[in-house]
């Protein structure tokens, strides 16, 4: 990164992208003897909060001021008002100290409107930056910031001139680092995935989902499971219109789900987002057996401890599949030697999902290449 002021850093999920950002920022602070402004961009408020926590576990705050620019409630000062952003940053800089800003792609334009000097900007899960609403601010900081880096495990390229993609070197620079997943597996940083495709009979759709998932859980003796559903509607139907939750409880499992529409639910009780993730990580570290269902909110970058397996109920693009697999290949106890990836096949979508998952695993873990998603039109 020191040899390039702009570029893409491609590292598989669990490979240490956040640590690269932190080390780069700390080195910058040590070598440049004046206050600097760092911006860290995340796709979700939840991930922005997590990144802030991880930064502050290592970076000393005696000469660094922390600002959050998004609509979430956090312990640090937070605002989306450009004038207040401008004032906060300039007060820190005028005293010769650093300003670290954590924001989301949704709110990045607010920092652009604040008209402040940004020395280094890190785009986490950078494949999100190509979205139509986010690209203008991304393009602006690519040109305006002194140093600009795009971190992702799953680049998104465009095959049409009418839509942005990370294969645009003027905005995204070149790939300056590409770490192959097999290397991380060999060195013991992440675990290899094991794909199990289970063909199941069809029937009433609601009960089919329930029975097929339960059969898959039973057959693989799983304790801590992530279920990737097709939609929030599918999760709600599974919980409300089948005996899935009763079946889980009979087997000694707790159950929980979180979506942007329904909020967080644990064993049928609505809870705060903070309690949900505290409980999820607590259960991940102890002997509690649980199933967590999600549509997309757990996919990108969120640290969830202890997950053994992901069960796909829906097809996704390469990014969604790769990110979901990434939740279960993080290191666990000595008994965890792989991350299980289960695809119950009981309709045409299931067959397509199985093929997509196999393709992603082959590309990332056998060929050692990133799973690139392509925009074709």
What kind of region is each of these model predictions?
Residues 51, 109-115, 125-141, 302-305:
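Conserved ATPase-coupling elements of RecA-like P-loop NTPase cores
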Residues 232-259:
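Conserved helicase motor "Helicase C" RecA-like lobe of SF1/SF2 P-loop NTPases
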Residues 128-190:
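Post-DEXD/H (motif II) to motif III coupling segment of the RecA-like Helicase ATP-binding lobe
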Residues 128, 260-372:
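Conserved RecA-like P-loop NTPase helicase motor core
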Residues 18-20, 34-59, 73, 230-236:
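Conserved Walker A/P-loop ATP-binding site and its immediately adjacent core
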Residues 4-24:
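Walker A/P-loop
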Residues 62-110:
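Inter-Walker segment of RecA-like/P-loop motor cores
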Residues 173-242:
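Conserved interdomain linker/interface between the two RecA-like ATPase lobes of SF2 helicase motors
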């Amino acid at each position: 990164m020191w040899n390039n002021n702009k570029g893409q850093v491609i590292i598989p999920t669990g490979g240490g992208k956040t640590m690269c950002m932190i080390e780069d920022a700390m080195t910058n602070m040590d070598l440049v003897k004046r206050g600097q402004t760092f911006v860290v961009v995340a796709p979700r408020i939840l991930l922005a909060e997590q990144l802030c926590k991880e930064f502050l576990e290592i970076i000393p705050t005696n000469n660094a001021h922390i600002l959050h620019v998004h609509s979430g409630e956090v312990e640090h000062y937070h605002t989306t008002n450009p004038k207040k952003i401008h004032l906060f940053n300039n007060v820190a800089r005028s005293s010769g100290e650093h300003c670290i800003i954590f924001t989301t792609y949704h709110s990045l334009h607010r920092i652009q409107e604040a008209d402040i000097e940004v020395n280094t900007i890190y785009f986490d899960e950078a494949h999100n930056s190509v979205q139509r609403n986010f690209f203008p601010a991304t393009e602006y900081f690519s040109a305006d910031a002194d140093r600009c880096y795009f971190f992702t495990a799953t680049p998104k390229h465009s095959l049409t001139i009418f839509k942005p993609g990370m294969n645009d070197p003027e905005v995204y620079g070149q790939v300056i680092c590409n770490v192959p997943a097999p290397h991380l597996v060999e060195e013991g940083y992440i675990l290899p995935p094991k794909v199990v495709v289970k063909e199941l009979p069809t029937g009433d759709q609601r009960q089919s989902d329930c029975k097929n998932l339960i059969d898959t859980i039973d057959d693989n003796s799983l304790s801590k499971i992530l279920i990737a559903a097709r939609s929030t509607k599918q999760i709600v139907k599974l919980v409300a219109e089948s005996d899935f939750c009763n079946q889980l409880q009979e087997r000694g499992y707790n159950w929980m789900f979180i979506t942007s529409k329904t909020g967080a639910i644990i064993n049928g009780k609505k809870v705060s987002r903070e309690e949900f993730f505290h409980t999820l990580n607590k259960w991940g570290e102890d002997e509690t057996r649980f199933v967590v269902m999600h549509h997309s909110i757990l996919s990108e970058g969120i640290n969830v401890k202890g997950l053994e397996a992901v069960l796909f109920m829906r097809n996704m693009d390469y990014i969604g599949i790769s990110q979901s697999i990434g939740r279960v290949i993080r290191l666990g106890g000595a008994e965890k030697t792989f991350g299980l990836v289960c695809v119950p096949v009981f309709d045409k979508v299931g067959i397509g999902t199985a093929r997509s998952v196999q393709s992603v695993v082959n590309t990332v873990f056998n060929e050692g290449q990133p799973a690139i998603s392509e925009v074709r039109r």
